[in-house]
């Protein structure tokens, strides 16, 4: 039988992305819009080459804790210690958040 690893035991690592932290602690991720359809949209509809994704307070805190060493569980414990309001359904929300980050290729998981 295969040994299944719990999702919150995964260790996230930030993919090769440019990102900055503003003075108020909010993370802004810079995403280049590449590909055939994006190129057409940029030329015809004057769409920008780069998109700037601003994370909220919790998302910014979590993003800055991703170091390729801590598991989702450990990051959740740190979030819970700093933000008392984050305790409600913490790991369900974190699991969804990390799934979205992975789907958009902002992060990868270390093996």
What do the predicted segments below correspond to?
Residues 1-36:
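Hydrophobic packing positions characteristic
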Residues 2-10, 44-111:
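Long, charge-rich, low-complexity alpha-helical segments
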Residues 29, 33-52:
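Alpha-helical membrane-targeting segments
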């Amino acid at each position: 039988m295969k040994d299944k690893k719990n999702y919150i035991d995964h260790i996230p690592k930030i993919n090769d992305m440019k990102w900055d932290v503003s003075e108020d602690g909010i993370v802004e991720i810079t995403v280049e819009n590449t590909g055939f359809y994006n190129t057409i949209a940029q030329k015809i509809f004057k769409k920008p080459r780069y998109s700037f994704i601003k994370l909220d307070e919790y998302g910014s805190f979590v993003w800055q804790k991703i170091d390729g060493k801590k598991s989702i569980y450990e990051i959740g414990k740190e979030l819970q210690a700093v933000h008392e309001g984050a305790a409600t359904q913490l790991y369900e929300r974190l699991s969804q958040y990390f799934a979205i980050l992975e789907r958009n290729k902002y992060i990868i998981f270390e093996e």
